[in-house]
Design a protein with these regions (language model features):
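Feature marking well-ordered beta-strand scaffolds used for ligand recognition
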Residues: 1-217
Length: 217
């Protein structure tokens, strides 16, 4: 798939032109590469320049194995201000002990983020699915310090499929939520689809988490 550099897709979400006061007085050395083009602080910006505006991409790894039988998959934030020299700056994952997720059944770990660039959430809140840990709302205003500000784990229903580990007589199966994909719309509603046949959940951000978003007056 051929995508422009400012487009996200499923497991990669660009956060371009993020204003970080920490870098307001940072200068570039004369031999530094040019920042990436195509956006508001790209090729037209002279060198040296203050680097308060930086570009990032949220890379969301996908869990594939049930009950933690693989390396932990998580959200990784990468600084791509200089596209030829990407730098990882932070990671985030749901703490396993917060819900005994390795023992709940099914997959545990990240899968995908929202893809809509609505101004309500862009550069502020990123939603990421974590299979049996539901969907997580992350404050990404400071990509160096990602913070969770909300989450929702749907309840299983009679329609929720089992997820198994092992084979034959040693096979063990459990019914588990598997929040698979998440998307938002331009009104701010959040849509979460379950991989284990539980269905679609429509959510609304509330409380302190809603104040991080940009719903306007």
């Amino acid at each position: 798939m051929d995508l422009p550099p400012d487009a996200g897709a499923h497991t990669a979400f660009p956060l371009l032109g993020m204003t970080l006061s920490e870098f307001a007085r940072q200068k570039l050395p004369a031999n530094a590469p040019m920042p990436g083009g195509g956006h508001d602080h790209g090729e037209s910006v002279p060198i040296p320049t203050a680097q308060a505006h930086r570009d990032f991409i949220a890379v969301v790894s996908e869990s594939l194995a049930n009950e933690c039988q693989e390396p932990r998959q998580m959200v990784r934030m990468v600084d791509i201000t200089f596209e030829s020299s990407p730098v990882g700056v932070s990671t985030w994952t749901v703490p396993e002990a917060s819900g005994n997720f390795c023992g709940r059944g099914g997959r545990f770990g990240s899968h995908s983020s929202n893809e809509n660039f609505t101004s309500i959430y862009y550069g502020r809140v990123l939603f990421v699915t974590f299979f049996n840990a539901g969907v997580r709302a992350l404050d990404v205003r400071d990509p160096f310090n990602i913070k969770e500000i909300g989450y929702y784990i749907p309840a299983t229903t009679a329609n929720t499929d089992r997820r198994c580990v092992g084979e034959g007589a040693s096979q063990n199966c459990k019914v588990a939520i598997q929040s698979n994909n998440v998307e938002v719309d331009d009104r701010g509603y959040v849509y979460v689809v379950d991989r284990a046949n539980t269905g679609l959940h429509i959510l609304e951000l509330t409380g302190a988490a809603r104040k991080v978003a940009n719903f306007g007056p």
